[in-house]
């Protein structure tokens, strides 16, 4: 695996040829249909959900596709969580102990909201992708770093985004369920599902 560190600079300007070349022989329709059968499924039984999404699929790529497709079509982005976290982290950027305490408290809130409401921010998306992947025997990592927009603004400081690296058939790929799932309508501050496959399995 590439040497990913906390200070990864993640830009989505990468070529996406690997996705098409490595998986062009796989029809993901079955995986997506299975994911659709579990629409609205609770997160109270993650092993059961992982089994349901993967048990009828043979390849690692298809199993991961079912997981990724389910997460990006069933987990809502929460603008309030994102805004509060960004504001607090900026305020505490020069206070390591205060930032640590905030992170500990906020992380608990994020996971409670994810479990009960299926709403989250990038941390929750990446966590859920990792847990479900590991439950079906796939190696998956969470990567913390910077969103591409912050690179352009030259405002690097505390890492502010999380995504995943997934190992399929011995090869590592990047994916970002947060950006695949949709966007926040800034006129209403409500999340709109709008799946974008560009962030699925990037080399």
Where are these regions (language model features)?
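Hydrophobic positions within alpha-helical membrane elements
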Residues: 7, 78-79, 181
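Hydrophobic/aromatic-rich core segments of domains that either
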Residues: 124-202
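Short alpha-helical patches at coil-to-helix transitions and adjacent helical residues
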Residues: 12, 43, 64, 122-126, ...
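Bacterial Sec-dependent N-terminal signal peptides
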Residues: 1-21
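A generic secondary-structure signal for well-formed alpha-helical elements
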Residues: 12, 71, 75-79, 136-140, ...
């Amino acid at each position: 695996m590439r040497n990913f560190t906390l200070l990864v600079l993640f830009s989505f300007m990468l070529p996406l040829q690997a996705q098409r070349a490595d998986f062009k022989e796989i029809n993901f329709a079955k995986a997506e249909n299975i994911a659709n059968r579990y629409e609205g499924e609770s997160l109270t039984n993650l092993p059961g959900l992982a089994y349901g999404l993967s048990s009828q699929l043979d390849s690692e790529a298809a199993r991961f596709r079912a997981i990724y497709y389910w997460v990006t079509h069933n987990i809502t982005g929460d603008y309030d969580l994102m805004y509060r976290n960004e504001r607090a982290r900026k305020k505490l950027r020069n206070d390591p102990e205060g930032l640590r305490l905030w992170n500990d408290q906020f992380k608990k809130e994020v996971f409670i909201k994810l479990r009960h409401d299926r709403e989250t921010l990038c941390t929750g998306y990446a966590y859920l992708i990792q847990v479900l992947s590991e439950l079906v025997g796939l190696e998956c990592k969470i990567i913390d770093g910077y969103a591409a927009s912050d690179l352009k603004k030259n405002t690097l400081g505390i890492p502010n985004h999380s995504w995943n690296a997934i190992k399929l058939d011995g090869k590592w790929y990047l994916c970002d369920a947060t950006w695949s799932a949709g966007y926040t309508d800034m006129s209403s501050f409500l999340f709109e599902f709008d799946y974008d496959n560009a962030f699925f399995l990037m080399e």
